[in-house]
Amino acid sequence: LVKSSAASDVYKRQPFNNVENIKEDILRSQKRFMEELGFVPDLFAFPFGEASENVISIIKDLNIKSAFGQHSGPISHKSNIHYMPRFSINENFGDIERFTFSSSLKPLIVNNIKPSDMFISNSKLLNFSFEVQNKKLINGLQCFGNLTGEWTSIDLIKNKSSVLFSEQTTYKEGRRRINCTSKFNGEWYWFGHQILIK
């Protein structure tokens, strides 16, 4: 199993880079794969998990079948096949207990995520919200994030079908991740999301 990624640190240097620069970087990566292996992988991993709608369109145009971000969660039938979640299984997060737990999780399916673009240019205007497809999961739902750099629980405002982060929620610049879970009938459900605040 071989997956491709970008050729350089263009994402790291300029997370809000224009799509043409990113496309050129991916094409360089594909060229190198062809030179070294004789084929171009049809799986892709977004560097640092960052992907706007425009970048996802590039991935589709390059005939990449599926791609992964760096947001945690199980895959569902509603997942964007060109921006799927995953769990890291490595030396820091790879013990058998974590693997067993991660593989047993059910997807917490959400709709109408706002803002829809993960790239946030003004955190003062950020009001993060989403709708939960299975309303039975709202009561037990809790969210955690590193929105200020440290992992903490997030105050939520819930109604019958949607969840809104409290107005008191604070955000700092950088790559920020959000994980929401809910336990129902003895099973855990998980939704992960990533944003990049400039």
What positions do the PLM features span?
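Terminal accessory/targeting
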Residues: 89-198
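His/Asp/Glu-enriched short active-site or ligand-binding loop at hydrolase and phosphoryl-transfer sites
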Residues: 12, 32-42, 50-95, 105
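Extended hydrophobic/Leu-rich segments
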Residues: 10-16, 26, 72-73, 93-96, ...
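Short Gly/charged-rich anion-binding patches and loops
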Residues: 6, 28, 54
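Alpha-helical scaffold elements lining the catalytic groove of polysaccharide deacetylases
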Residues: 9-37
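Single conserved hydrophobic/aromatic residue that forms the stacking wall/gate
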Residues: 1-7, 11
